[in-house]
A protein has these predicted regions:
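Contiguous, structured surface segment used for ligand recognition
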Residues: 1-110
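Aromatic-lined carbohydrate-binding surfaces of glycoside hydrolases
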Residues: 109-243
Length: 243
């Protein structure tokens, strides 16, 4: 069934829900030119609820006609719910049409759903991005259910500041991680095992880890670069896991 909205009204309960509501309001304004108003729960078309007993990596949508309630433990699940809504609407001027019912409980099949987007000179485009471009990309990924972004620490990988790549890569990583943390978006670091002493490798990693606000995963590729035998590779990974 299709449901139409004009002058969309939103209610939010809980700190993360208020943050998520601001994201939803911004997305609607960018599509319609009209900023939805905040209201109380009895008048809201969409209510966002931060529920301590809700899903962290999923969400519930309760639907009664055109009225919707998005429910999740925190901002991550609420952003996922917003993404579902945005993917199922059509916009014409200021009119929004939900093209199908979307009520239900949504849980991911895969625990890790990530994308690598390290700030460096080797990509074709996003070395020219700034932090707000990354914020935009993070949200776009989360609207489709992504829960992890993977960055690449700068360890002499050839990244140099220039007229396109304006920021220090390591400083950029720190701030990009901070933005990810605002959205409860997991951060993975792609960190290869190069030919260097364990002591030097630990020092380099410790410097990065101490500066970076959020790190959930360190991913050490088995090669390209790195050519350790399996036993030594695993041993070094275990040492790094204790940092």
């Amino acid at each position: 069934m299709r449901h139409e909205y004009s002058n969309l009204k939103i209610f939010a309960q809980g700190g993360d829900a208020i943050k998520a509501a601001e994201i939803l309001r911004g997305e609607i304004e960018s599509r319609t030119g009209a900023m939805p108003q905040m209201t109380d729960s009895g008048k809201a078309d969409i209510s966002l609820i931060a529920d301590p007993n809700g899903l962290r990596d999923g969400y519930k949508i309760e639907q009664s006609g055109s009225r919707l309630v998005f429910r999740a433990r925190g901002i991550r699940g609420l952003i996922f719910a917003i993404g579902m809504f945005l993917r199922k609407i059509e916009v014409s001027g200021e009119k929004i049409t939900l093209i199908q019912d979307i009520g239900g409980e949504y849980k991911p099949d895969k625990r890790i759903r990530g994308h690598q987007l390290g700030y460096r000179t080797t990509p074709n485009s996003y070395d020219a991005w700034d932090l707000e471009d990354y914020r935009r990309y993070y949200l776009d990924l989360m609207f489709f259910g992504c829960n992890t972004v993977e960055h690449i620490p700068y360890d002499g990988l050839g990244a140099q500041q220039n007229r396109l790549m304006k920021y220090d890569p390591q400083d950029f990583l720190v701030e990009a991680s901070r933005i990810a943390d605002e959205y409860d978006l997991d951060v993975s670091l792609w960190y290869p095992n190069d030919r260097e002493s364990l002591e030097d490798a630990e020092k380099r990693r410790r410097r990065v880890f101490e500066r970076t606000p959020r790190i959930n995963v360190m991913f050490p590729p088995g090669g390209d670069p790195g050519d350790y035998d399996a036993d030594e590779f695993i041993s070094r990974c275990r040492d790094f896991s204790r940092l």
